[in-house]
Amino acid sequence: LHLLSRRQRQMCIRDSLGGALLLGTYFLFAQKQPVDYVNPLMGTDSKISLSNGNTYPAIALPWGMNFWMPQTGKMGDGWAYTYASDKIRGFKQTHQPSPWINDYGQFSIMPMTGRLRIDQEQRACWFSHKAEKATPYYYSVYLSEYNLTTEIAPTERCAYFRFTFPETKDAYIVIDAFDRGSYVKVIPEENKIVGYTTRNSGGVPRNFKNY
C-alpha cells in the first residue's frame, strides 16, 4: 500500500480541481457559436436629425431572400425600428438596404387580443426591451397590452412565427400589405392565406408585386 504524503495529496486535489475547471470552461465556450455574440439591436438608437445608427434588428439567414424585423415606425417610414420607441406596430418582412433608400415589397403581421384594431396607430402595442430577445436567428417579445408573446425564426425564403395567446376567444392576426394596389385573401377551408404587396420606393417595374 502506497501512502501519499499530505503535500502530495494537496497537489493531486489541486490538479484535479484545475482540470475540472478547464473542462467546465471548455464546455461553456463550446456551446456558443460566433453568431451568439451578434447583437442585432446595436445601431438601432437612430435619430433622423443626426443620421446616426440607421440600422434595424434583422432576423435573417445570410443571403436570405427576405429579412424580418419588429416594426416601431409608421408604414413606409425608413426608420422602421428605433430603440427609443416603446410601441410595436407589427412584424415586417423587409428588403430595406438603408432608411434613406427605404423599403420595397414589404408587409407586416400583427397579433392582438381584445377588440380588433386594423389602423396602425390603434393597434400599436407597448413593449419593453426587458421582455425582448434579439438574435439573428431568433426574436421574441412580449406585447403587454395584448398579453401575448411573438417569436420569429427565419428561413432561407420566409420565417416561422409563433404567437402565444392567452385563453380568449378574441384573438386576431392582422396582415397589412400597406398599399391599395396590394391584395390579401384568406382561404379558411385550406388553412391558407395568399396575396401580394405592391409597396415600393421607386425603381421597380410597373407590374411589381411581392407574392
Give residue ranges: language-model regions.
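Accessory carbohydrate-recognition regions in carbohydrate-active enzymes
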Residues: 31-211
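Single conserved hydrophobic/aromatic residue that forms the stacking wall/gate
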Residues: 1-15
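N-terminal export/ancillary region detector
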Residues: 21-22
